[in-house]
Amino acid sequence: MTYFMLFLGLCFVLGGLGVASNPSPYYGVVGLVLASVVGCGWLLSLGVSFVSLVLFMVYLGGMLVVFVYSVSLAADPFPEAWGDWRVVGYGVSFIAVLVVGVVIGGLVECWDLGVITVDSVGMFSVRLDFSGVAMFYSCGVGMFLVAGWGLLLTLFVVLELVRGLSCGAIRAV
């Protein structure tokens, strides 16, 4: 199980690296899907089934819509692929930063965290992630609405930015 968790963590980092190297929106969506599937599988193996399902629906329902709009509005005739030198340079630099972070974290010895699941202990009969979802929708409804409006505003900002220099609000005067 430890090797499986290590493999999921490595695949999650590689998916994030695929999004961060950003060769083109065509290829960035592949990294996003890989990172979301592996991240939700990682949460599922820790026992957080409901949160994993909700995150999977949000990532694939919300983020892929933004990528579809970006791809349709910023179509490149010759997109950069994974093998281009600039994309490979980004990937190598991100991996170098990750290795430096792991080395510094090993020197500081901050990796003694352990793995904690969401199973309740003792007389409790409700899992902790289900009770957290109930608290989220009861006490946190105001912040939930603010976050929804923020995501809607972000969608409109991204659509306006990728619309083009000649038609959008950001253009040369």
From Swiss-Prot:
InterPro entries: ComplexI_Subunit6, NADH_UbQ/plastoQ_OxRdtase_su6, Nuo/plastoQ_OxRdtase_6_NuoJ
Cross-referenced Gene3D superfamilies: NADH-ubiquinone/plastoquinone oxidoreductase chain 6, subunit NuoJ
Enzyme class: translocase
Protein name per UniProt: NADH-ubiquinone oxidoreductase chain 6
Gene name of the record: MT-ND6
Membrane topology field: Multi-pass membrane protein
Annotated source species: Synthliboramphus hypoleucus (Guadalupe murrelet)
Entry's family note: Belongs to the complex I subunit 6 family.
GO cellular component, one term: mitochondrial membrane
Role according to the record: Core subunit of the mitochondrial membrane respiratory chain NADH dehydrogenase (Complex I) that is believed to belong to the minimal assembly required for catalysis. Complex I functions in the transfer of electrons from NADH to the respiratory chain. The immediate electron acceptor for the enzyme is believed to be ubiquinone.
Top-level taxon: Eukaryota
TM helices/strands, residue ranges: 1-21, 27-47, 48-68, 87-107, 139-159
